[in-house]
Amino acid sequence: MEGYSRNGEISPKLLDLMIPQERRNWFHDEKNSVFKTEEKKLELKLGPPGEEDDDESMIRHMKKEPKDKSILSLAGKYFSPSSTKTTSHKRTAPGPVVGWPPVRSFRKNLASGSSSKLGNDSTTSNGVTLKNQKCDAAAKTTEPKRQGGMFVKINMYGVPIGRKVDLSAHNSYEQLSFTVDKLFRGLLAAQRDFPSSIEDEKPITGLLDGNGEYTLTYEDNEGDKMLVGDVPWQMFVSSVKRLRVIKTSEISSALTYGNGKQEKMRR
Protein backbone atom coordinates (compact mmCIF):
# COMPACT_ATOMS: atom_id res chain seq x y z
CA MET A 1 0.00 0.00 0.00
CA GLU A 2 0.95 3.55 -0.49
CA GLY A 3 2.03 5.43 2.56
CA TYR A 4 3.71 2.43 4.07
CA SER A 5 7.42 1.80 3.78
CA ARG A 6 8.99 -1.48 3.20
CA ASN A 7 9.74 -1.87 6.88
CA GLY A 8 6.06 -1.37 7.72
CA GLU A 9 6.49 2.20 9.10
CA ILE A 10 4.09 5.00 8.36
CA SER A 11 5.43 7.52 5.89
CA PRO A 12 5.41 11.28 6.57
CA LYS A 13 2.75 11.90 4.00
CA LEU A 14 0.41 9.59 5.82
CA LEU A 15 1.15 11.37 9.10
CA ASP A 16 0.23 14.69 7.54
CA LEU A 17 -3.11 13.30 6.52
CA MET A 18 -3.86 11.79 9.93
CA ILE A 19 -2.84 14.79 12.22
CA PRO A 20 -4.95 17.94 11.92
CA GLN A 21 -3.39 21.18 10.79
CA GLU A 22 -3.79 22.98 14.21
CA ARG A 23 -2.09 20.20 16.08
CA ARG A 24 0.72 20.30 13.67
CA ASN A 25 1.18 24.05 14.07
CA TRP A 26 1.21 23.78 17.86
CA PHE A 27 3.70 20.97 17.66
CA HIS A 28 6.02 23.01 15.44
CA ASP A 29 5.77 26.04 17.74
CA GLU A 30 6.64 24.04 20.81
CA LYS A 31 9.49 22.43 18.98
CA ASN A 32 10.83 25.78 17.84
CA SER A 33 10.54 27.30 21.35
CA VAL A 34 12.45 24.40 22.85
CA PHE A 35 15.18 24.83 20.26
CA LYS A 36 15.33 28.55 20.91
CA THR A 37 15.68 28.16 24.67
CA GLU A 38 18.41 25.60 24.18
CA GLU A 39 20.18 27.91 21.77
CA LYS A 40 19.97 30.79 24.26
CA LYS A 41 21.49 28.62 26.95
CA LEU A 42 24.32 27.68 24.66
CA GLU A 43 25.00 31.27 23.57
CA LEU A 44 28.18 32.95 24.77
CA LYS A 45 27.61 36.29 26.58
CA LEU A 46 29.89 38.94 28.01
CA GLY A 47 27.83 39.40 31.22
CA PRO A 48 28.27 37.37 34.39
CA PRO A 49 26.26 34.21 34.84
CA GLY A 50 22.80 34.55 36.39
CA GLU A 51 21.50 37.35 34.18
CA GLU A 52 19.09 34.98 32.50
CA ASP A 53 17.49 34.25 35.84
CA ASP A 54 17.13 37.98 36.41
CA ASP A 55 15.40 38.40 33.07
CA GLU A 56 13.00 35.62 33.86
CA SER A 57 12.23 37.12 37.28
CA MET A 58 11.57 40.49 35.61
CA ILE A 59 9.14 38.88 33.19
CA ARG A 60 7.37 37.13 36.05
CA HIS A 61 7.17 40.40 38.01
CA MET A 62 5.66 42.20 34.99
CA LYS A 63 3.04 39.49 34.75
CA LYS A 64 2.17 39.87 38.45
CA GLU A 65 1.82 43.67 38.30
CA PRO A 66 -1.73 43.75 36.90
CA LYS A 67 -2.81 41.32 39.62
CA ASP A 68 -1.31 43.56 42.32
CA LYS A 69 -2.98 46.63 40.82
CA SER A 70 -6.34 44.91 40.89
CA ILE A 71 -5.85 44.00 44.55
CA LEU A 72 -4.89 47.59 45.41
CA SER A 73 -7.92 48.94 43.58
CA LEU A 74 -10.19 46.66 45.60
CA ALA A 75 -8.52 47.73 48.84
CA GLY A 76 -8.86 51.41 47.88
CA LYS A 77 -12.61 51.03 47.64
CA TYR A 78 -12.84 49.91 51.25
CA PHE A 79 -10.36 52.51 52.57
CA SER A 80 -11.43 55.49 50.47
CA PRO A 81 -11.43 59.08 51.99
CA SER A 82 -15.23 59.17 51.78
CA SER A 83 -15.47 56.21 54.14
CA THR A 84 -12.90 57.68 56.53
CA LYS A 85 -14.81 60.98 56.71
CA THR A 86 -17.83 59.27 58.22
CA THR A 87 -15.69 57.64 60.91
CA SER A 88 -13.78 60.87 61.65
CA HIS A 89 -17.03 62.76 62.30
CA LYS A 90 -18.04 60.20 64.89
CA ARG A 91 -14.83 60.65 66.86
CA THR A 92 -14.73 63.25 69.60
CA ALA A 93 -12.74 66.43 69.03
CA PRO A 94 -9.24 66.31 70.55
CA GLY A 95 -8.44 68.50 73.55
CA PRO A 96 -6.43 71.71 73.36
CA VAL A 97 -2.75 71.27 72.69
CA VAL A 98 -0.59 72.13 75.69
CA GLY A 99 2.66 73.89 74.97
CA TRP A 100 6.05 72.88 76.20
CA PRO A 101 7.12 73.25 78.93
CA PRO A 102 3.71 72.37 80.37
CA VAL A 103 1.96 75.02 82.44
CA ARG A 104 0.93 73.96 85.91
CA SER A 105 -2.73 73.83 86.88
CA PHE A 106 -2.64 76.64 89.45
CA ARG A 107 -1.02 78.99 86.91
CA LYS A 108 -3.77 78.13 84.44
CA ASN A 109 -6.37 78.93 87.09
CA LEU A 110 -4.68 82.25 87.81
CA ALA A 111 -4.54 83.11 84.12
CA SER A 112 -8.17 82.13 83.56
CA GLY A 113 -9.24 84.03 86.64
CA SER A 114 -7.42 87.17 85.55
CA SER A 115 -8.81 86.91 82.02
CA SER A 116 -12.37 86.43 83.37
CA LYS A 117 -12.03 89.54 85.57
CA LEU A 118 -10.84 91.59 82.63
CA GLY A 119 -13.71 90.28 80.56
CA ASN A 120 -16.28 91.22 83.21
CA ASP A 121 -14.88 94.74 83.46
CA SER A 122 -14.83 95.21 79.71
CA THR A 123 -18.32 93.83 79.01
CA THR A 124 -20.19 97.07 79.32
CA SER A 125 -22.69 95.87 76.70
CA ASN A 126 -24.12 93.37 79.18
CA GLY A 127 -24.48 96.11 81.76
CA VAL A 128 -22.22 94.53 84.37
CA THR A 129 -20.07 97.56 85.02
CA LEU A 130 -23.05 99.86 84.79
CA LYS A 131 -24.85 97.86 87.46
CA ASN A 132 -21.80 98.01 89.71
CA GLN A 133 -21.60 101.77 89.28
CA LYS A 134 -25.29 102.12 90.12
CA CYS A 135 -24.86 100.01 93.25
CA ASP A 136 -21.91 102.12 94.37
CA ALA A 137 -23.86 105.31 93.79
CA ALA A 138 -26.84 103.94 95.74
CA ALA A 139 -24.58 102.94 98.63
CA LYS A 140 -23.08 106.40 98.71
CA THR A 141 -26.51 108.03 98.83
CA THR A 142 -27.81 105.71 101.57
CA GLU A 143 -24.76 106.18 103.78
CA PRO A 144 -24.95 109.19 106.10
CA LYS A 145 -22.72 112.05 105.13
CA ARG A 146 -19.67 112.05 107.33
CA GLN A 147 -18.52 115.55 107.95
CA GLY A 148 -14.86 116.21 108.49
CA GLY A 149 -14.05 116.62 112.16
CA MET A 150 -13.25 120.17 113.31
CA PHE A 151 -10.42 119.30 115.66
CA VAL A 152 -9.01 122.16 117.70
CA LYS A 153 -6.02 121.93 119.99
CA ILE A 154 -6.62 122.76 123.68
CA ASN A 155 -4.04 123.43 126.41
CA MET A 156 -4.55 123.80 130.17
CA TYR A 157 -2.54 125.69 132.71
CA GLY A 158 -0.27 123.34 134.68
CA VAL A 159 -0.64 120.41 132.25
CA PRO A 160 2.25 119.99 129.77
CA ILE A 161 0.32 117.67 127.49
CA GLY A 162 -2.14 119.21 125.04
CA ARG A 163 -5.29 117.56 123.75
CA LYS A 164 -7.65 117.96 120.78
CA VAL A 165 -11.41 118.54 120.77
CA ASP A 166 -13.82 117.85 117.90
CA LEU A 167 -16.11 120.89 117.78
CA SER A 168 -18.37 119.24 115.19
CA ALA A 169 -19.42 116.73 117.89
CA HIS A 170 -20.68 119.56 120.16
CA ASN A 171 -23.76 121.77 119.82
CA SER A 172 -23.36 124.18 122.74
CA TYR A 173 -20.90 125.72 125.17
CA GLU A 174 -22.16 123.49 128.00
CA GLN A 175 -21.18 120.35 126.10
CA LEU A 176 -17.78 121.83 125.39
CA SER A 177 -17.17 122.65 129.08
CA PHE A 178 -18.20 119.11 130.06
CA THR A 179 -15.69 117.66 127.57
CA VAL A 180 -12.89 119.90 128.90
CA ASP A 181 -13.62 118.78 132.46
CA LYS A 182 -13.52 115.14 131.37
CA LEU A 183 -10.20 115.56 129.56
CA PHE A 184 -8.21 117.41 132.21
CA ARG A 185 -9.66 116.32 135.57
CA GLY A 186 -7.42 113.29 135.89
CA LEU A 187 -4.38 115.12 134.49
CA LEU A 188 -4.71 117.90 137.08
CA ALA A 189 -4.90 115.33 139.87
CA ALA A 190 -1.77 113.60 138.55
CA GLN A 191 0.19 116.89 138.65
CA ARG A 192 -0.19 117.25 142.40
CA ASP A 193 2.66 116.43 144.77
CA PHE A 194 0.81 113.85 146.88
CA PRO A 195 -0.67 110.71 145.35
CA SER A 196 -4.31 111.12 144.33
CA SER A 197 -7.20 108.73 143.99
CA ILE A 198 -10.47 108.88 142.09
CA GLU A 199 -12.15 110.50 145.10
CA ASP A 200 -9.55 113.31 145.15
CA GLU A 201 -10.32 114.27 141.53
CA LYS A 202 -12.43 117.41 141.71
CA PRO A 203 -14.60 118.58 138.78
CA ILE A 204 -13.52 121.67 136.91
CA THR A 205 -16.39 124.13 137.19
CA GLY A 206 -16.96 127.78 136.28
CA LEU A 207 -15.14 127.59 132.94
CA LEU A 208 -17.70 129.77 131.16
CA ASP A 209 -18.82 132.31 133.80
CA GLY A 210 -15.44 132.98 135.46
CA ASN A 211 -16.59 131.88 138.96
CA GLY A 212 -14.25 128.89 139.14
CA GLU A 213 -10.52 128.44 139.50
CA TYR A 214 -10.06 128.13 135.73
CA THR A 215 -11.61 129.91 132.74
CA LEU A 216 -11.92 128.77 129.12
CA THR A 217 -10.58 131.13 126.45
CA TYR A 218 -9.91 130.84 122.73
CA GLU A 219 -7.79 132.37 119.96
CA ASP A 220 -9.50 133.26 116.69
CA ASN A 221 -8.20 133.34 113.12
CA GLU A 222 -6.90 136.88 113.56
CA GLY A 223 -4.83 135.99 116.63
CA ASP A 224 -7.06 137.73 119.19
CA LYS A 225 -7.67 135.99 122.55
CA MET A 226 -11.25 136.12 123.88
CA LEU A 227 -13.54 134.48 126.43
CA VAL A 228 -15.52 131.44 125.38
CA GLY A 229 -19.29 131.95 125.57
CA ASP A 230 -19.51 135.66 124.79
CA VAL A 231 -20.47 135.18 121.08
CA PRO A 232 -23.04 132.89 119.43
CA TRP A 233 -22.01 129.27 119.07
CA GLN A 234 -21.90 129.16 115.23
CA MET A 235 -19.76 132.28 115.13
CA PHE A 236 -17.44 130.79 117.69
CA VAL A 237 -17.09 127.54 115.72
CA SER A 238 -16.34 129.38 112.47
CA SER A 239 -13.63 131.61 113.97
CA VAL A 240 -11.92 129.53 116.69
CA LYS A 241 -8.32 128.46 116.10
CA ARG A 242 -7.09 127.27 119.52
CA LEU A 243 -8.52 126.78 123.03
CA ARG A 244 -6.78 127.56 126.31
CA VAL A 245 -7.77 126.93 129.92
CA ILE A 246 -6.11 129.57 132.12
CA LYS A 247 -6.43 130.64 135.72
CA THR A 248 -9.19 133.12 136.42
CA SER A 249 -6.73 135.44 138.15
CA GLU A 250 -4.77 135.86 134.88
CA ILE A 251 -7.70 136.82 132.64
CA SER A 252 -6.90 140.54 132.62
CA SER A 253 -3.36 139.98 131.36
CA ALA A 254 -4.31 137.23 128.89
CA LEU A 255 -7.17 139.04 127.14
CA THR A 256 -5.28 142.08 125.88
CA TYR A 257 -7.29 142.55 122.67
CA GLY A 258 -10.43 140.67 123.49
CA ASN A 259 -12.66 143.08 125.40
CA GLY A 260 -13.11 145.72 122.69
CA LYS A 261 -13.63 143.14 119.98
CA GLN A 262 -16.16 141.19 121.98
CA GLU A 263 -18.18 144.33 122.61
CA LYS A 264 -18.25 145.01 118.84
CA MET A 265 -19.33 141.42 118.12
CA ARG A 266 -22.13 141.62 120.69
CA ARG A 267 -23.51 144.73 118.96
From Swiss-Prot:
Q: Which Pfam families match?
A: AUX_IAA (PF02309)
Q: Does the keyword Transcription regulation apply?
A: yes
Task: Name its cellular compartments.
Answer: Nucleus
Entry keyword set: Auxin signaling pathway, Nucleus, Repressor, Transcription, Transcription regulation
| Residues spanning the signal sequence | none
Q: Which InterPro entries match?
A: AUX/IAA_dom, AUX_IAA, PB1-like
Gene Ontology CC: one annotated term:
nucleus
In this chain the PB1 domain maps to 149-248
Q: What is this protein called?
A: Auxin-responsive protein IAA18
What is this protein's gene name?
IAA18
